[in-house]
């Protein structure tokens, strides 16, 4: 598995040994970033990226390679965080990224929550959010609602949700669906955060 675009194009990413983590395939990542850049005014350049259910970090790392300013990776699985640390170090992106151990569906206490998230309270809201949860469990909608309630999202931020095509994803309140595209058994949805919670 490799970075498919930007200044780190072609660089290898560490991959999971188990089936518990399902990284976004290179072909799908390339299609996704083409849609963002050509269909949504390139929201990647200069973005503050939040990668929820980060796994290997492929989506957030791809965004950093393509000009994002900062990425915060959130995953509660030990294997995922180990892969994230390995990939961030191998790509030399430690200065523009952070990794948090957190349940992505429980961000509603807020990024400003009295030190509860450690250094997260000092982070500005995010302009581009990737969600690639385990398919078919309704976790993406829960995570979106939680991130919105917790103040993690900038007004007008773009959300990219990767879900099983058969899951019939419905965006929670506060999000406008901009686009829905099918790729084999996967569906990509692009949503816009409509403002404050």
Give the label of every model feature segment.
Residues 1-197:
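Class I S-adenosyl-L-methionine-dependent methyltransferase catalytic core
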